From Swiss-Prot:
Job of this protein: Catalyzes the dehydration of L-rhamnonate to 2-keto-3-deoxy-L-rhamnonate (KDR). Can also dehydrate L-lyxonate, L-mannonate and D-gulonate, although less efficiently, but not 2-keto-4-hydroxyheptane-1,7-dioate.
Family: Belongs to the mandelate racemase/muconate lactonizing enzyme family. RhamD subfamily.
Name of the top EC class for this enzyme: lyase
Protein's gene: rhmD
Recorded catalytic activity of this chain's protein: L-rhamnonate = 2-dehydro-3-deoxy-L-rhamnonate + H2O
Positions of Mg(2+) binding: 222, 248, 276
Residues flagged as site, Increases basicity of active site His: 298
Keyword Magnesium attributed: yes
GO BP: any one term: carbohydrate catabolic process
Enzyme Commission (EC) number: 4.2.1.90
Domain of life assignment: Bacteria
Site (Transition state stabilizer): 345
Organism listed in the record: Escherichia coli (strain K12)
Name the UniProt record assigns to this protein: L-rhamnonate dehydratase
Length: 401
């Protein structure tokens, strides 16, 4: 089989700072009013009273959705979405295009390495540039799968289990239990600036959910980089009587020594996890060395599927789990091939967590959601990532080449 070359790469955005609030899509933080994801949630900005009530108050939704589409010479296309908005479009159309167009559709690793190497001088340790590279990488995997007629998980070597089981992230673990999920992860609402009173309030929330959910249902806390090691350690011990399964991303990404200390002093049996906002393979290697229990890369932010596979190998070599930050189909196709991912995350994007809304709604069509907390591998048996782009969304292409 002679594989075609890539003819063109195109980039669109939707949502972001210039759009109406609530576009959703690849930037799932961009939700409308009265949504749990924009409630009073602890963040690194919570120490400033002007920005503690809402994550959108400090601009968490200003980037918007980036859509990258790659077209082969035979007319077939692949696409992906992430969070990078209009600035990501510029990077794709004015810089990364030269490494993509003219390459064979199977040259994914070559393109990936060239994109990483060419952006080192302005990418730093991740962020917007890495989000953009991730989106391109995912689009390339989607195109390759469509050209050869295989789902991405089969390109990675095939499934190691028949189904993926999920825990749910949202404000209502009790509802997640009713939907068949194996656990529920809640955001914390208080931080070091709130002192011991904040610890008591979040521990009381865990206690309340433990009473509602029973003893056998997993409960976890997502701290979203909002704490210091002393506060995190005290919170972990305050929640230990309620059988908290893990405490997540307590600290900013680069505080490796503090993660090491937190793991050393955490209650016996409680896992320490992180990785959502780490943006390079090297940062995950260092994070792994701290001894945390689970690494949680976001495939749309860490360098794409190509990097995620490498991160999983690092974790496996140390006996650690890799459970990606919820990324819908882009992580489904990966984790079903990983032996060290026994479960995965589903992010509840319905406003009150009472219904099953696809994570990237409305930008993806045919995006699967768990049924009774699970997705069978047969649901993934479509070429590429198995989803289509909703072109009825307000897509803008601000740059071309």
């Amino acid at each position: 089989m002679t594989l075609p070359k890539i003819k063109q790469v195109r980039a669109w955005f939707t949502g972001g700072a210039t759009a109406e609030k609530g576009a959703g899509g690849g930037d799932y933080h961009d939700q409308g009013a009265n949504h749990w994801i924009d409630d009073h949630i602890a963040t690194p900005m919570s120490k400033y009273r002007d920005y503690e009530q809402s994550r959108q108050s400090f601009g968490i939704n200003v980037l918007g959705t980036l859509v990258v589409e790659v077209e082969a010479e035979n007319g077939q296309t692949g696409f992906a979405v992430s969070t990078a908005g209009e600035m990501g479009c510029f990077i794709v159309e004015k810089h990364l295009n030269r490494f993509i167009e003219g390459k064979c559709v199977s040259d994914i690793k070559l393109i990936h390495d060239q994109m990483l190497s060419a952006t080192l001088y302005y990418s730093g340790s991740g962020g917007l540039v890495m989000n953009t590279i991730s989106c391109v990488d995912l689009a390339l995997w989607d195109l390759f799968g469509k050209v050869v007629g295989l789902p991405v998980y089969k390109l990675l070597g095939g499934a190691v289990r028949d189904e993926i089981q999920f825990y749910a992230t949202g404000a209502r673990p009790d509802l997640a239990k009713e939907m068949g999920f194996i656990g529920g992860k809640m955001p914390t609402h208080w931080g070091p600036h709130d002192g011991d009173a904040g610890i008591r309030k979040d521990a009381a929330m865990v206690a309340d959910m433990r009473e509602k959910c029973g003893e056998d249902f997993w409960l976890m806390l997502d701290c979203w980089m909002s704490q210091d090691v002393n506060y995190a350690t005290k919170l972990a011990h305050a929640c230990a009587p309620y059988n908290l399964k893990w405490i997540e991303e307590c600290l900013p990404p680069q505080q490796y020594e503090s993660y090491r200390e937190l793991k050393r002093n955490a209650p016996v049996g409680m896992m320490v996890t992180s990785g959502e906002h780490h943006g390079t393979l090297q940062s995950f290697r260092t994070l792994s060395e701290t001894g945390i229990d689970i690494m949680q890369p976001d495939v749309g932010w860490c360098g794409g599927l190509t990097t995620l596979v490498e991160i999983a190998a690092i974790a496996k070599s140390r006996g650690q789990l890799v459970v990606p930050h919820g990324s819908s189909v882009y992580s489904h196709h990966a984790v079903i091939t990983f032996t060290n991912t026994p479960f995965s995350e589903f992010l509840m994007t319905s406003p009150d967590c009472s219904t099953m809304r696809p994570q990237f709604d409305p930008i993806l069509l045919n995006e699967p959601v768990p049924v009774n907390g699970r997705i069978h591998k047969s649901v993934l048996d479509k070429p590429g990532f198995g989803v289509e782009l909703n072109r009825d969304c307000n897509l803008k292409r601000p740059y071309s080449h």
